[in-house]
Amino acid sequence: AGLVYQETECKTSSAWNIGRAIKNVPVDRCVELSRAVIGELRSSVTAHFTVENSTAEVTYVLEKDQSLVRVELKVDWKEIGKDIIPVLTWQTPLSYQTDAFRYDVPAGSTVRRGINNDVPGLRYGMALRMDGSSAILVSDSKYGYRGQKESLNLTLINSSVSPDPYPERGIHTITLWVGAASGDAKEAEDIATGCNHKIFYQPTNCHHGELPLEDSLVSVASHSAVITAVQPTTDGCVLVRGCETSGERSAVKLSFGTEVKEAQAVDLFEKTKDNAVETD
């Protein structure tokens, strides 16, 4: 897996469309390679690449007990579109062939066939496999995935000239995660959520305290449902939004870090519904 520099047809390219590919060149000219971090919990390697007039600093990070490799990209992009449109992509070769790809969409996921065009995915693309683990590619900020029989790709930079002639020049910071999962929609959603929501922390000195070493505001137990948002309401309550990921009926159990006096089901407009809700 790695970066690929593409030249695409200007006539069929725009800010919204990736044009017909004319040339694909792997970004493999590594001018510097160094160990960034060496430790029991985290190890990383940083590689510096040159591509045409641009440079890419790529850090590969592997952390303890993590199933995905984190790829931190810092690209100084200087390419300008003219007769051809320069495009930078990430390509993940597959060890198997497939024509089914799962992508997350608002309030769920969808499975699409492989086509020679980018399709939208909010945070991840997954190349589904009938037997065995499925390759998954997660992004923090890019949405144009392309599933093909033997690869799972993601467009990172598209230097189109329409409508803006200089849209992408400058420093781009992008984080990707590459790994494997079972192919289950809920597991993929949990993986993408975990990757994109870092732990917030506050350093301090050593002292005594009354709070437990670990706690949680809310957690969910469900076969196929996930939490998508937790927010306060105007009347002082807590609103928990969620969705079912597989198109099935699924019971949901929410556990809070405090006593719950009352609970009710509401729709997207916070109107009360008749769905059964129990508290204990």
Residue ranges, per PLM feature:
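C-terminal (or distal) subdomains of carbohydrate-active enzymes
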Residues: A1-D280
